[in-house]
Amino acid sequence: YEHLFWFFGHPEVYILILPGFGMISHIVAYYAGKKEPFGCMGMIWAMMAIGLLGFIVWAHHMFTVGMDVDTRAYFTSATMVIAIPTGVKVFSWLATLHGGSLKWETXXXXALGFIFLFTVGGLTGIVLANSSLDIMLHDTYYVVAHFHYVLS
């Protein structure tokens, strides 16, 4: 039953973040004085990739339930692949800021804080994507920190 729970419940995590990504893109572009974010089409493709990949990585929440090594290897690899489109988004946000005249207002500071915390959460997520490390870090504050950093 755990597979059913995560198979249907996990993709929503990656789908629910998409509007937040859109808001950050608009906020960063506005407060950098740009008309649109850097790499607009790349950002759109990255969001579609993140949404689709969310459907094939559910079992990274289940590394400790006795999956065989081949299954763990697949979910480790598939989970790490999510870092690629996510990195495209973070790079594009930072590239949007580059060369602009950043206005240090509340919404710009919140967007920069989100980008920083989301990046730290992504780095901890890459560590947790490794099934061997995930098993060792299971039920620790490292996992709690990852979850909260990604949620920013």
Swiss-Prot record:
It is a multi-pass membrane protein. Mg(2+) binds at H138, D139. GO terms for cellular component: mitochondrial inner membrane; respiratory chain complex IV. Pathway: Energy metabolism; oxidative phosphorylation. O2 binds at Y14. The keyword Signal does not apply. Residues 32-39, 98-105 are mitochondrial matrix. Binds 2 heme A groups non-covalently per subunit. Binds a copper B center. Its main location: mitochondrion. It is an enzyme of class 7 (translocase). It is found in: Mitochondrion inner membrane. It catalyses: 4 Fe(II)-[cytochrome c] + O2 + 8 H(+)(in) = 4 Fe(III)-[cytochrome c] + 2 H2O + 4 H(+)(out). Belongs to the heme-copper respiratory oxidase family. Component of the cytochrome c oxidase (complex IV, CIV), a multisubunit enzyme composed of 14 subunits. The complex is composed of a catalytic core of 3 subunits MT-CO1, MT-CO2 and MT-CO3, encoded in the mitochondrial DNA, and 11 supernumerary subunits COX4I, COX5A, COX5B, COX6A, COX6B, COX6C, COX7A, COX7B, COX7C, COX8 and NDUFA4, which are encoded in the nuclear genome. This is Cytochrome c oxidase subunit 1. The lineage of its organism: Eukaryota, Metazoa, Chordata, Craniata, Vertebrata.
